[in-house]
From Swiss-Prot:
Pfam families: G3P_acyltransf. This is Glycerol-3-phosphate acyltransferase. GO terms for cellular component: plasma membrane. It comes from Mannheimia succiniciproducens (strain KCTC 0769BP / MBEL55E). Catalyzes the transfer of an acyl group from acyl-phosphate (acyl-PO(4)) to glycerol-3-phosphate (G3P) to form lysophosphatidic acid (LPA). This enzyme utilizes acyl-phosphate as fatty acyl donor, but not acyl-CoA or acyl-ACP. It catalyses: an acyl phosphate + sn-glycerol 3-phosphate = a 1-acyl-sn-glycero-3-phosphate + phosphate. It is a multi-pass membrane protein. Keywords: Cell inner membrane, Cell membrane, Lipid biosynthesis, Lipid metabolism, Membrane, Phospholipid biosynthesis, Phospholipid metabolism, Transferase, Transmembrane, Transmembrane helix. InterPro entries: G3P_acylTferase_PlsY. It is found in: Cell inner membrane. The keyword Cell membrane applies. The chain crosses the membrane at residues 4-24, 53-73, 80-100, 115-135, 153-175. GO terms for molecular function: acyl-phosphate glycerol-3-phosphate acyltransferase activity. Belongs to the PlsY family.
Length: 205
């Protein structure tokens, strides 16, 4: 691995550490996502605490902070392994942000953004898997875990030279969801739209 690639990975980590969920919630007057809803500073939790447009802004920002470094690294001539490490650095920054006491999000949107420049086909398969599981179950966490588990196989089939680094990213995503997996096993995980259903029920009373 080149010295330039190592410096680039560090810069990517610092970029990934910018938590859009925390900053945007502060900007629009929403509660701190680390203290509300699921406690996760990510787009899904921002949606839970009532900010649809804020959640969309968070989602776009988190995707871009994974996508832009990998895309630029590709044109700067980084090797597939180095690009994979850049993707991992972006996710590590999002999950363990240095600016916010290393308490970050789950990394799904950032991982999607980082994988997209490798292959739009892989990104589409990843998104399609997430969407199908979400529509069938209503659980964002379950959708993310299953998408993370199958994405390395998509990569192996389409762009095999990226299989190992992408598998590392996906393992990180699964690890980051270990608490969600436990709640799913116990039947205690909330569906994304559960909050909105409760709100509608309370308004109808």
């Amino acid at each position: 691995m080149s010295f330039f690639a190592i410096l680039y990975m560090l810069a990517t980590y610092f970029l990934g550490s910018i938590s859009s969920a925390i900053l945007i919630c502060r900007l629009v007057g929403l509660p701190d996502p680390r203290q509300s809803g699921s406690g996760n500073p990510g787009a899904t939790n921002v949606l839970r605490i009532g900010g649809r447009w804020a959640a969309l802004a968070v989602l776009i920002f988190d995707i871009l902070k994974g996508m832009i470094p990998v895309w630029c690294g590709y044109y700067l001539g980084l090797t597939p392994f180095e690009l994979g490490m850049v993707a991992l650095s972006a996710c590590l920054g999002h999950i363990f942000p240095i600016y916010f006491k290393f308490r970050g999000g789950k990394g799904v949107a950032t991982a999607f953004g980082a994988i997209a420049p490798i292959s739009w086909g892989i990104a589409g398969a990843m998104l399609g898997t997430w969407g199908i599981i979400f529509l069938l179950s209503g659980y964002s966490s379950l959708s993310a875990v299953i998408a993370a588990l199958v994405t390395p196989f998509y990569v192996w089939w389409i762009r095999p030279e990226f299989t190992f680094p992408v598998a590392l990213v996906c393992c990180l995503l699964v690890y980051r969801h270990h608490e969600n997996i436990q709640r799913l096993w116990r039947g205690q995980e909330d569906k994304v739209w559960a909050k909105f259903k409760k709100k509608e029920d309370s308004q109808g009373e």
